Amino acid sequence: MSGSKAESEEKAGSKQCPLVQVNEYKENEHIAYTSLRPIQITTLRKTAKVYLYPFSLSNSKLGLLKLSKSPVVNNSSKSVVHKKKDRKKTRRKVLTSKMKALSSKADSLLLKSSVDAYTESTRLGPKRTSDSATLSVDAESSDEDSAPGLDDFSGLSPYERKRLRNIRENANFFASLQLAESAARLRGMIKKRESPESKRKRPKKKENEIGCRRSMRLLKVDPLGVSLPASPTQPTLVEEEENPLLPPGPLEMIPENQDDSSELLKASLKTWAEMSQTSNEKTKKGLSSIKSYKANLSGMVISEATVRKVTKGAISSVALHPSEVRTLVAAGAKSGQIGLWDLTQQSEDAMYVFYAHSRYVSCLSFSPTNPAHLLSLSYDGTLRCGDFSSAVFEEVYRNEGNSPSSFDFLNDSSSLLVGHWDGHLSLVDRRTPGTSYEKFFNSSLEKIRTVHVHPLSRQYFVTAGLRDVHVYDARFLKSRGSQPLISLTEHSKSIASAYFSPVTGNRVVTTCADCKLRVFDSSSISSQLPLLSTIRHNTVTGRWLTRFQAVWDPKQEDCFIVGSMDHPRRVEVFHESGKNVHSLWGECLVSVCSLSAVHPTRYILAGGNSSGKLHVFMHQET
């Protein structure tokens, strides 16, 4: 029996886990090692025995280690379990108020000691590697060892004492690193770099350097280098107006371009006054064919003798005297001048310039009943009649508040219809004494550029506004709220002019800034005027040129004439259907003729440009 027990015990002993023995480890102190940080030497002086036991983590919340219920391991692990229970009980103790106070006091004392140690280490300098801290496994594992400075805290738990000891050791370790001294040493090694400043070198002055040439006139020095005396200061003069307003009332016909020409002027005026009114026999016979009309246009030429500068500024209106004997052309300028040129006389004295107005002369026309009367309208608010028989410019109408823009004759040459820039209309009777209007009407247009009366039905007239063309009946005009009979709204931009055909009035031609010429059928004035044709034509004259205005030819009522921007410079003739009939051009025509006037019976055309020159196309005399 005893032998069997011994065998069983041996078997049980053989099943126990083998013991693992860890040999003692020591660092080799003979190895040469250079480091910036002090070497920390750790010496293990005890032999640690590690027992491996199977365990399971079943309660992660409490962190308890549950050993397996193996009968072989049960006896050997009792001592380990009792020790763990004792440690847990110690950690779970609640600190009293006195112990908490002691703990806070210990923390402050340790922190103070660590700061003092760090300061002392900085003062003394670097220590040798032999003075490094030595840690042992026994000191770390033992919770009961006493440390200097902790005698007053005997009431603390081993855990608190160990925590305070670790704080002190960490403070001593960081003090041994001497970080402050290393930082100061590095600052001394770093040299401050000076900011690079780009210093510009001043150019060296040359002793014999030649200076720039300067105007001796501006320096007020004569060629010999002698300074000139200072010029006396002149008093500033107030600049007078270029064209001052003329006094109201009649003005004498005194030419501005001739000094002593009273006898010549009287002779010319007498000749113009004796001009008989042209007969309308050719017009009454009817219109010629397009073929013959085109042939007559081909015979019209321009020469140096038919080109003359008659005004100071740009020409703003042109009129041809209806005489069949003499060729007399009148031109109004933007400066207010009126030029008269008699092409029948070949001398230089055949041209006269008069100052009848002080501003832009927008409309000029000879009286249909008395060709010796030349009527002119200006932006200065006056309408005057130049009487060649009396050599006087009589004042017919004055309205400086509402600047007039255009006029036309009504039933006879004594009654005038005047359009204003603000959209009003005035009825003026030349037979009434005074310079005021008879009636004053308000149209439906914001502005009125041109006014033209129907040649047969004199009660109708057409007006060109900003973007619309209106046809009115003079019998139904009111002082306020006058409504047109017909409104032509096909235009998309500003309108320059609108005119009835001169014989029958069956057509209306308009000139618009949208580069289109439009012809309307006005044979039956009803609620609407049908659009017959639209002609593409460049009407963009710009700022410095007078705007184009298409005018009918009384000799051929279905054709009209307009200036052109094309090269070579020309004046174009169009049929009402839109077909180009003929173009008048020549070597002497080198500028744009914006405005044109046509003789009612003779093949004569006069065009004016923006430099004050008249260009006349006519048949050559054989």
From Swiss-Prot:
GO biological-process terms attached to the record: DNA damage response
Annotated Basic residues bias: 80-94
Example of a GO MF term: enzyme binding
Repeat region (WD), residues: 310-351, 356-398, 400-438, 443-482, 490-530, 540-584, 587-622
GO cellular component, one term: nucleus
Keyword annotations from UniProtKB, A to Z: Repeat, WD repeat
Region (Disordered): 75-94, 120-155, 189-209
Subunit: Interacts with CUL4A and/or CUL4B.
Protein family per UniProt: Belongs to the WD repeat DDB2/WDR76 family.
Function comment: Specifically binds 5-hydroxymethylcytosine (5hmC), suggesting that it acts as a specific reader of 5hmC.
Protein name, per record: WD repeat-containing protein 76
Chain's gene name: Wdr76
